Every structure is written in structure tokens, then in C-alpha cells.
A protein has these predicted regions:
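An anion-engaging/catalytic patch
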Residues: 1-139
Length: 144
């Protein structure tokens, strides 16, 4: 697993969500199940249940990581997003790649989840590409 980085927050649909990169690949944006539950207005328990019911559909290390399964050296990173009590009480703390998020939303099967999926893909996951593209352009210009 690549190192996880907390790169601040962004406002999405009026909700402040963390910008997390790493885990599946360097500089790859990822999302916690907790954040997904907030965006979709669903209890975290329901999101985790949906993941657990379909866990065979997710590829570990590509789509999903369970941060409670030893992927983190310590829980310090998670304290940016959860309190100690929540971390201790959680059976699973899922982290999903863009691909994993798309798979999960497919299981939700509601029109609202489809709308949110498209919006999140454009405004959260695609933002990484725009930022990286700007950095490359700046680098090329500076090299001239």
C-alpha cells in the first residue's frame, strides 16, 4: 500500500470532505466509506453493510482496502477524520479507489446515487487530473 496523504478538504454538495491521496497508487485520490455515507446521506453502517454484502465483487488493493486489517502502522492518520472511539468501535474502516467507489455506487441502484456519482467523479476524482495537468504545464513552461 502506498502512503496515505491528507491534502486538506474541499466542499462537495455543501459538505466539507477530506482530500485523501495514496493507498492504491501514488497521488491517486481515494475516499473513505465514512465520507461516502455523508455524501449520500446514508448511515455508515448501511454503507459498510452494502460493501460487506458485495465484498467478493471488490478487488482488495485495487478497489478497496480495510484500514482496520493492518494496512496502517497506527491509527494516527485516521484521527484526521474520526475520533478514537469511532476508530476503536469500527469493525471495518474502508478506503475505496475511484474504481471501488464506482462499483459501490452501482450496488446502491437509486437515481440519486447515480447523480451523486457523476458529480463526485467530475468534481472530486477529476480534479486530481486537472491539478496534475496544470503542474505538468507549469513545469514545461519553466523548462523553456
Amino acid at each position: 500500500m502506498n502512503e496515505l496523504k491528507n491534502n486538506g478538504t474541499q466542499i462537495f454538495m455543501g459538505i466539507e470532505i477530506p482530500i485523501i491521496e495514496g493507498g492504491f497508487g501514488e497521488n491517486q485520490k481515494v475516499i473513505l466509506a465514512k465520507t461516502i455515507s455523508e455524501i449520500h446521506g446514508q448511515p455508515l453502517k448501511k454503507i459498510n453493510q452494502l460493501i460487506n454484502e458485495n465484498i467478493d465483487e471488490f478487488e482488495v488493493g485495487v478497489d478497496i482496502l480495510d484500514l482496520k486489517s493492518g494496512y496502517l502502522q497506527s491509527t494516527e492518520f485516521l484521527l484526521n477524520f474520526m475520533n478514537r472511539q469511532s476508530i476503536s468501535n469500527s469493525t471495518n474502516i474502508y478506503l475505496l479507489s475511484e474504481q471501488g467507489y464506482m462499483l459501490l455506487v452501482g450496488f446502491m441502484k437509486t437515481e440519486q446515487s447515480k447523480k451523486i456519482r457523476k458529480k463526485l467523479r467530475r468534481e472530486y476524482f477529476a480534479m486530481r487530473k486537472a491539478i496534475n495537468s496544470d503542474k505538468k504545464s507549469t513545469s514545461i513552461i519553466n523548462d523553456l
